[in-house]
A protein has these predicted regions:
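Membrane-embedded beta-strand positions of outer-membrane beta-barrel proteins
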Residues: 28-32, 52, 63-65, 103-107
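Eukaryote-skewed repeat-based solenoidal scaffolds used as protein-protein interaction platforms
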Residues: 95-129
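Residues that define the transmembrane beta-barrel architecture of outer-membrane proteins
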Residues: 44-48, 75-79, 118-124
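Short loop/turn motifs that connect adjacent beta-strands in outer-membrane beta-barrel proteins
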Residues: 20-26, 58-60, 87-104
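Residues on the lipid-exposed face of transmembrane beta-strands in outer-membrane beta-barrel proteins
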Residues: 50-54, 81-87, 124-129
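Cleavable N-terminal export/targeting peptides
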Residues: 1-24
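Outer-membrane beta-barrel initiation region
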Residues: 22-53
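Transmembrane beta-strands of outer-membrane beta-barrel pores
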Residues: 32-38, 67-71, 107-113
Length: 129
């Protein structure tokens, strides 16, 4: 998946998720990193990292994407999109017990695309706050 397609997909997903939901809080960061003398990856590498996290009444979401480029022009994109749905907020019931404040349906889409291979993993389960 190309970077433009990935960015458009994430923007569409974020917009659809928050059309009717004003964020209680949200945070965005953009970080650039350049390094030399790596032993495991290309000797010189530039990495751009985008992160976004937000909480709305019924859910929260965390997203990050690393776009890496080596001096040999090898490119790689890795991202994770992790929305969680609050069962307490959806049901209107207090689901707190002991140190647990809420029970959530937790999901993650992790994906990697580079010059050699790519993968998509979809994870789901129960989460606790």
């Amino acid at each position: 998946m190309q970077l433009k397609q990935l960015a458009a997909t994430c923007l569409l997903v974020s917009t659809a998720a928050f059309v009717q939901a004003k964020p209680i809080w949200q945070d965005f960061s953009l970080t650039g990193l350049y390094g030399e003398n790596y032993e495991v990856v290309d000797e010189k590498q530039t990495t751009l990292t985008i992160e976004y996290a937000a909480k709305v009444k019924y859910a929260d979401v965390f997203f990050f994407m690393d776009r890496m480029r080596g001096s040999d022009d090898h490119k790689s994109t890795y991202f994770e999109l992790s929305p969680r749905l609050s069962l307490g907020e959806v049901s209107g019931q207090k689901l707190a017990f002991g140190p647990i404040k809420d029970v959530l349906i937790s999901t993650t889409w992790e994906s990697n695309n580079d010059d050699f291979s790519s993968f998509d993993n979809f994870l789901y389960g129960v989460g606790f706050d």
